[in-house]
Amino acid sequence: LDLAARGTVTAVADSLPRDVLLRHDDYDDKFDPHVWMTPDLWMLVVQNVRDALIVARPDSAEVFRANAEAHLAELADLSTYTARILSTVPTESRVLVTAHDAFNYFGAAYGFDVLGIQGISTESEAGLRRISDLVDVLVNRDVQAVFVESSVSDRNIRALIEGAAARGHKVVVGGELFSDAMGEDGSYEGTYVGMIDHNATTIARALGGDASIDGMNGRLNG
């Protein structure tokens, strides 16, 4: 799909400071693209979107500035909430095991060790060795919960749970996270704020933290 042929295209994440971006073993010359996983980084992206829109439509500059200001305030509240509830997860429980490697920015921001079964792309495949190594982590670090993702098959997560069970260690699915897709259109979880609220609340509750099942705004479906 050639988006540039249909109009102006701005890669809004390209202008993020390089010192906040994470490299990944899957890509020698590119950065981990999942910058939306923390509100603080996404606030920088919103500012870039605002500026790009103003350049494209200077006649609507005041509207873009006002909308961005309102959304940035909402993201600031989300950032505060997310940091607060995740800080209640016991240090020894801060191991986040997910279907694919999408949560490295999350881990860096909130002090979690992040382990994805698949690589950074949902199209990559996990080998038996990778699953075996992760079973070792679950057992040795007494990990109690792992997480499926809405956009990735749960097959490998189930294999992890079964592998741990075979070694006498019980692991449960802590919940479903949104990584490369948000919730259903029209739902709270189908918005950026709702997606991050859902992820942070789900992780905190599953790993022993203190968070209301209703989330930041009392709007999560639970």
Feature names for model-found ranges:
Residues 1-222:
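Extracytoplasmic metal-acquisition and chelation regions
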